[in-house]
């Protein structure tokens, strides 16, 4: 079956700019946002399904970007609004396939996505090498899109005590922007970013315990066509998880993971570390509705907290102070409000 729908959302915004050295400036906009949806579902069998969805969504620029005001709060990073910005429109196509085999207890999920934005709002950056000042102004630009696919499989072996899980992910993203050096003509910049990820898990399960071994790899490849520069990073991980079912309804859980990163320019992040967490829990009450859990995080004090952000104009590594080793006590109460 299928469904077709559309949303209309009228929107009006009024902005007043009050500056000490200029008369009051008023910016008023009235628009109609248009968002269509098409949803197609096909059932091959009771447990095998396909879903295809299209969604369109209009989005208006925010007031801060539209205001014709120069923000000099940070003298080295000046921001100038653009009242000529147009609304952006995003197209999203999604495909989902799910199949479950009850005989072999095998579950398979595949997903694909394509997304592009018309009149996407991006930043035009002008850099003055003499003063070190960056001036940023929002502009409309086309050509920003991404495509993504993922696949997961969960299946037991012939010996049902063994379970195999895999997850694969691939994404390609194209980001456009403008940059200017020393007030010259703006130059269009484009960054192509490829991300690949693979996770494998094997679990051995008995009535007394569950033991899991896992490995993973994340690959990132970014290319900037202005500087003609390519960067590659590899994130490896390997670890184990152990859950023991103890007497008196208690459970002990440990997870230990080894991380190795290569290709990063920041030496503090491009190093190996271990992450070890441990928790002890017990259920109470007649139907075990109350769960008390004591968990210790980062026992070895080796956590590294860093985020890499890739845009059309820059690659930015942000390092955060990690919280360090700490513990938490959880009390979880499950209530059934629907009765028996």
Locate each region found by the language model:
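Exposed, low-structure sequence patches enriched in small/polar residues
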Residues: 1-340
């Amino acid at each position: 079956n299928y469904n077709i729908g559309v949303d209309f959302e009228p929107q009006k915004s009024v902005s007043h700019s009050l500056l000490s050295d200029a008369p009051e400036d008023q910016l008023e906009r009235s628009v109609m946002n248009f968002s269509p949806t098409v949803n197609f579902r096909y059932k091959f069998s009771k447990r095998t399904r396909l879903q295809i969805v299209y969604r369109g969504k209009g989005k208006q620029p925010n007031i801060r970007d539209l205001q014709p005001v120069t923000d000099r709060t940070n003298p080295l990073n000046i921001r100038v609004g653009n009242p000529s910005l147009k609304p952006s429109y995003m197209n999203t196509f999604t495909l989902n396939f799910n199949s479950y085999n009850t005989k072999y207890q095998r579950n398979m999920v595949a997903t694909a996505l394509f997304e592009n934005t018309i009149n996407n709002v991006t930043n035009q950056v002008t850099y003055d090498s003499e003063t070190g000042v960056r001036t940023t102004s929002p502009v409309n630009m086309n050509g920003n899109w991404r495509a993504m696919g993922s696949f997961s499989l969960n299946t037991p072996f012939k010996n049902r005590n063994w379970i195999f899980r895999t997850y694969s992910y691939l994404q390609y993203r194209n980001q456009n922007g403008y940059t200017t050096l020393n007030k010259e003509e703006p130059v269009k910049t484009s960054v192509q970013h490829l991300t690949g990820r693979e996770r494998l898990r094997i679990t051995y399960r008995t009535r007394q315990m569950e033991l899991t071994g896992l490995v993973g790899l994340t690959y990132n490849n970014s290319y900037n066509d202005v500087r003609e520069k390519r960067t590659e990073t590899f994130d490896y991980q390997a670890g184990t998880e152990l859950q023991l079912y103890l007497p008196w309804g208690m459970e002990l859980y440990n997870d230990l993971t080894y991380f190795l990163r290569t290709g990063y320019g920041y030496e503090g992040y491009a190093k190996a570390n271990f992450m070890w967490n441990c928790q002890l829990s017990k259920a109470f009450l007649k139907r075990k509705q109350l769960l008390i859990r004591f968990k210790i995080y980062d026992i070895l004090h080796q956590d590294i907290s860093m985020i890499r952000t890739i845009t059309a104009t820059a690659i930015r590594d942000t390092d955060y102070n990690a919280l360090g080793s700490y513990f938490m006590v959880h009390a979880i109460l499950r209530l059934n409000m629907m009765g028996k």
